[in-house]
Amino acid sequence: MDYIFVRFLAMGVAGVAWATFICQGISCVLAIVVVFRHLGALQSEKKAVWFSMPVFLQICTVAIPSILQQSFVSVGNIIIQSLINGFGASVIAGYAAAIKLNNLVITSFTTLANGISNYTSQNLGAGKYERIHDGFKAGIKMVWTLSVPLVLLYVIAGRWLVYLFMDSSSGPAMDTGILILRILAPFYFVVSVKLVTDGVLRGSSMMGAFMIATFTDLILRVSIAAVLSSKLGSIGIWSAWPVGWALGTMLSLFFYFRAKKNHFLLKSREMVQIEEEEKLEV
């Protein structure tokens, strides 16, 4: 749609906006139709209520932190963009090209993490805590399997990928884009672990832990970028990403393994209680 509105209808920036609005609107309507069709197929003895305050509040405990997280991420990106703007058009163009390629990878990791989040919720509700850890390990294997070819591609063939967004005459911009990819790509193994772990935390409704890890990553990235950019130039901004990812990952893993330990303790207590009840019955 973007291509059609811009290339053939010559609508420029407005065409991109209208294409986005139309596509997302159609997706929204289709999603609602599919949901209601599946809900109508469900059989239940109880009549479904149109609105439940307890359910609404439970949804809010997960939704509001997620909304805040996305809002603060956007604010952080604006601050980083303002730092980048101070280095001129070439750096801005190189960053714009590299960040598109970076977002392609992060979006792939996020999609897998969302699947892990749903998997975690289902097994948590069923009381199958050991399967949560199995899902976590499977998620790590999947994102690392995806990371290997992407890291090699971005590090070795980053120049040709950046060519997709600019021509060879944009020398400084090209060099900036390649440098960003070579700095960020090796740390995809790190940020992928964070995103999978965050998916487990969200699926476990541990939104406090999720927000702490996410905001720590964001605050560190922005702060370090601001400090290093004054000393190292634009390289300082790109170097802030891996630092934020690494510390955010450590926090996410800390909260995950603490939760895992508590769940297994809970399970062991339930097993002991069942065994004691069986002995009394005998």
Predicted regions and their residues:
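Short hydrophobic/small-residue motifs within alpha-helical transmembrane segments
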Residues: 188-189, 216
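Transmembrane alpha-helical segments of integral membrane proteins
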Residues: 220-228
